[in-house]
């Protein structure tokens, strides 16, 4: 069975409660989670600072994250206070680019939007950002943390290439896409945190690749409902699986084996990232909080024997805020 195969591979360090309580935890972790700033509180503080009738770009970014990337929204609340605004700006920028592909009916329109963002980034570095909320916040982050333009443009370039509705030819091609998008975003996040460390960069590279692979898996049910399949073709061919098998939501063993191989690659990247843990500065850990949701998905898909269409995989994890807080408190990733 595929499940037993993954179980035989040495996994990352245990995530259970036994390891957690070797240090004294807070008496009520849920109480700490409840103290996290809610969007309504942020909205009130923003309104007080901005004055009546003045739209706030930071609030816009938070709303965008809350609606479109809730996991990143929660993670941003656990950043150091002086970095939260810039971190949410980066994630909102990523959301703006990610939703272009699904929001346009013609590739030409998508290319125009990507060109808008490419010019916006160039203008930010000339202190002339467009009057668009995410662009304004990103410009402030660029100024505050001296962010690297190359990483921002690399994300745009790779997202633009991905406007074509084509499956990845290989798992390596998917990893390249993830490196140029998710890993680049993490390099920028490390700059926001003031971390310049080669081990942190290596961890970011692997976590970004794991993020890209898991995102591809998680989106498969949605894409198949639109008669699209983006899973790596080389893995599908290896197991004799066609795109039509995924469109029909086939649950045969060879289909599960495709999912197993792809999920195992994400698992391996997480394992590699954690091998640097002792050498990564603790200041970098907030950038890597997303490993909580990545590991949660990989564990869930293992429990359902790699049935990528199982309903439980589409359910939100109500304990995610608590899990993120505990991981942040433990200073682990």
Swiss-Prot record:
Coiled coil: none annotated. Residues 1-44 form a transit peptide. InterPro entries: Isoprenoid_synthase_dom_sf, Squ/phyt_synthse. Disulfide bonds: none annotated. Its main location: mitochondrion. Transmembrane segments: none annotated. GO terms for biological process: biosynthetic process; mitochondrial respiratory chain complex I assembly. It holds the Pfam family SQS_PSY. It is found in: Mitochondrion inner membrane. GO terms for cellular component: mitochondrial inner membrane; mitochondrion. Keywords: Membrane, Mitochondrion, Mitochondrion inner membrane, Transit peptide. Involved in the assembly of mitochondrial NADH:ubiquinone oxidoreductase complex (complex I) at early stages. May play a role in the biogenesis of complex I subunit MT-ND1. Belongs to the NDUFAF6 family. This is NADH dehydrogenase (ubiquinone) complex I, assembly factor 6. The lineage of its organism: Eukaryota, Metazoa, Chordata, Craniata, Vertebrata.
